[in-house]
Amino acid sequence: WRTDNVRAQKQPGYSLATITLPLGDLTSHQARAVAVIARRFTGDTMRTTVDQNLLLRWVSDADLPEVHAALASVGLDEAGAGTIADVTACPGTDTCKLGISASRGLAGELRRRLRVVQAAAARELHVKCSGCYNSCAQHHVADIGFLGVSRVVAGRRVPHFQLVVGGQWSENAGAFGLAI
């Protein structure tokens, strides 16, 4: 957890702790627990991230073991924030009227399969799944992105995903990926 989810702040003695939220989901019980953790360890502040995780700032380095234990007690101690297994997805056809493809279903399966990737270079890749052209998951700036589209197969329009590779996530999204 500490390797993937904790980063040193500029201010000595403090760290940023990312809470990995699989597919951006957490229960109301977990949300209340995170509020208690934030009040206790960060002065009552937290942020959401573009990767659909939560970020605790101003965590004293001395408090990191306690923060981890508190997160573990509610099932929020998953490592892998910002790695290839930390797949971002929009709601897709689950709840969005514009959804063409089931982006959450794809993201869940990718997440399950990519958790075993241990090569350092591959672990740093970003994967994002958008269920339609609106790009809510920002697939176009991911190293590996999926865009929900439809195709005609045997005379019927059916959902598919278009693969997009090579987007630049860092440096203010300096490049869009190329559709394959």
Residue spans for each PLM region:
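Peripheral terminal and linker regions in Fe-S/redox and tRNA-modifying enzymes
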Residues: 1-180
